[in-house]
């Protein structure tokens, strides 16, 4: 068997796109037949890569929210901040047994959001409220 007759190790993008288009058009043209495209390799690869990309965007968005925390104001706990701390401990009791660093990040984010909501001098916050 020559090398031209063997299947390629990796499927190219052009052949994958052609295959998807042909399967979609053939499944739309035939009536009464349930298309089995979701079980094909190209569809599984597409959905897997898309879900990983979506998950990466969610993680980056969460990290961007953490970076936006005002780092020096979160350590000056006022009575309102202590009340917020106890309030979020009541809402998320499972966080007491988890990682302490993760607890600190969530607490700092919650306290910062609470402080931003109390601070009416922010011009962009006035537009939102």
Curated annotation (Swiss-Prot):
Almost completely overlaps APS1. Disulfide bonds: none annotated. The keyword Membrane applies. It is found in: Membrane. Keywords: Membrane, Transmembrane, Transmembrane helix. It is a multi-pass membrane protein. Its main location: membrane. The chain crosses the membrane at residues 49-69, 72-92, 101-118. It comes from the Eukaryota. GO terms for cellular component: membrane. This is Putative uncharacterized protein YLR171W.
């Amino acid at each position: 068997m020559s090398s031209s007759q063997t299947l390629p190790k990796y499927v190219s993008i052009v052949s994958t796109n052609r295959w998807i288009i042909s399967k979609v058009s053939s499944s739309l043209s035939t009536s009464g037949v349930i298309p089995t495209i979701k079980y094909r390799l190209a569809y599984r690869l597409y959905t897997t890569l898309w879900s990983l990309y979506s998950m990466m965007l969610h993680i980056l968005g969460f990290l961007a929210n953490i970076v936006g925390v005002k780092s020096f104001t979160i350590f000056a706990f006022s009575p309102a901040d202590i009340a917020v701390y106890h309030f979020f401990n009541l809402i998320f009791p499972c966080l007491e047994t988890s990682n302490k660093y993760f607890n600190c990040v969530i607490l700092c984010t919650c306290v910062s959001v609470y402080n931003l909501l109390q601070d009416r001098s922010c011009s962009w916050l006035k537009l939102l409220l």
